Amino acid sequence: MQEWRKWGSQVVHIGRDDSACVTQSPLPAPQAAPSPSADGTAATGRGSADVDMDENGQSADCLRFPDGTGMEATPRGCRMAQRYWAIVGEAPDCRQITQGAWAWSAVFISWVMRKAGLDNDQFLTGQSHSMYVVDARDGILPRPAFHIEPLPAVPRPGDLICAGRGRDKYLSDPSEVGFGTTPMHCDIVVAVDTAAGVVKAIGGNVQQSVSMDEIELNDAGQLDGFTNSHLPWLLIMRNDLQ
């Protein structure tokens, strides 16, 4: 939570309507790039409904931070993201930090685990979430801090919740995850409100910042891979240290 506050306490709501919108941010909305008009010049007036929708079909009032904007594009954000990369021996510059090839969500998790006191027998740091997912799935470590639990299930504070991304967004089973080859995203669960049907989880490089995701659960109060197509969750890394 302390690290999240250093980034400005950004919140992203992941709803059952397939939305994923920033609801709280220390920064104003990024200025939209002008859209081309029919004659090839930049349009200055209001665009059509199609222009006002992002790539996921969400309306213009859904705040998002594209690459090159948001907290990671500030000097402070760059310095903090560079700290996370240092945990795996890398030193990207501030331009690289804002590029997809240097996505820093996995090294954020690695940094947090080391700060929490986990050693190499419990959790191995990695540049890819799939590295430590496979470690936990295959029982690689002598004293593992986590084991894999398939969904649907109810997360608990201290667990990691993970989803596939890109070409592997819709994986159906944790056995399909390849070590260092499957693009993924994982968040750290910090609170579960069963009455409201919401899980709160903190992750890095979410809308170009360390953000708290407020994730709506299914009708049974569980996390699953179907309730929100923005992040079709695949598994829980269950915390065995609690």
What residues fall within each predicted segment?
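...with weaker cross-activation on analogous glycine-rich loops/strands in unrelated enzymes
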Residues: D121-Q208
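Assembly/interface hotspot detector across virion components, adhesins/toxins, and nucleic-acid enzymes
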Residues: V11, V189-V192, I215
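Low-complexity, Gly/Ser/Thr/Pro-rich intrinsically disordered linker/tail segments
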Residues: N205, S209-Q242
